[in-house]
Amino acid sequence: MAKKTNSNCLVLVTGVPGSGKTLVGLQLVYTLDKLDEEINGVFLSGNGPLVEVLKHALGKESKSFVQPVHNFLKEYGGNVNSIPHENIWVYDEAQRAWDSDQVLAKRGHGNSEPDDIVKIGDRINSWSVIVALIGEGQSIHVGEEVGLPLWANAIEKSGKDWRIFCPEKLESDFSEFN
């Protein structure tokens, strides 16, 4: 839909730990890559050991579609002249995205990670889809405490219209955007 309508979409997928969110995200990126050469996706994770295991298990192909989220954001988040070739970003454990204080401490600028990802989507001249995989009750480190409201805040600050797709239990957080 996003490609056909040239629109930006945020898709929120929720579930308890172990419910298969990560697998769904990986399958989405992998399948889309095989189906359509014009659709490029990337699986982003802040879990370094998971990224390494996936890269090892998937071999050469993984380098193009599995990346550490912090490396991706170092390259594209703070650099307004750099635009990724992917239009679909699957962010695993998106409730653990860093707030602006943590990003400032780690990368030297004051946007939250959701701000950076949404701004990347805003810079793309065509369409983009962010799939945020949300683990319930899993914001566990400094800079991750705010959680889901960071995503609503980033969409609110965006200069573009974003379509939001989410479970009913999250609709009230994003109702003003649809």
Give each language-model segment a name.
Residues 1-9:
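N-terminal pre-P-loop "Q-motif" helix
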Residues 83-86:
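A short acidic, Gly/Pro-enriched loop at the edge of an enzyme's catalytic core
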Residues 56-80:
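Short glycine-rich substrate-engagement loop in P-loop NTPases that contacts/grips substrate
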